[in-house]
């Protein structure tokens, strides 16, 4: 005979002196699957000795024509107190947490740690184990070093571009002062032409202008 009910949170146990009957899960795969779905137990697989008690069925689900209480062929369990079961699980979880917190910490707590070790301890809860956290830290340190290198390269390029612009501006101004370029032309051409002119081209232009002896009138 069955010993207890398989429904979550149900404490019904077989006793011939109480008016509760127990019923096996259907053998028909479709009906059996529907029962399992309604029971709503995670990873639940009923066996041949798995039962539900009569408290989970409506009165219309029973065939009372004989001497024993039997379920009709289309009967499905629809009466469950899931709220009580969830509250019970939460209560057990809180009690377990209180029990774990009641144990005093063991081992020395005043060890001096370096920066990487401190970060490892503070954030190791996000990883499965400390070694995984340490590998993650090493990877992040490499990424930071790579970004710093790229930043340094960008700054160097920016400084070179600034120096090139200053040299180009001074060169055009000198040509303008020596009447090799019309007055005021620098304000027109510098913002557009010289910004994209390579330094090598400026040097070539400077050499060409030095070879000229006749100024522009």
From Swiss-Prot:
Checking PROSITE patterns in the record gives: ZF_THAP
Keyword annotations of the record: DNA-binding, Metal-binding, Zinc, Zinc-finger
ZnF (THAP-type) spans are 1-80
**What SMART domains does the record tag this protein with?**
DM3, THAP
Under SUPFAM superfamilies, the record lists:
Glucocorticoid receptor-like (DNA-binding domain)
Which N-terminal residues, if any, form the signal peptide? none
**What domain of life does the UniProt record list for this protein's source?**
Eukaryota
GO cellular component annotations, sorted alphabetically? Answer: nucleolus
A GO molecular function held by the record: zinc ion binding
Q: Where is this motif: HCFC1-binding motif (HBM)?
A: 122-125
Protein name (record): THAP domain-containing protein 2
Organism from which the protein derives: Mus musculus (Mouse)
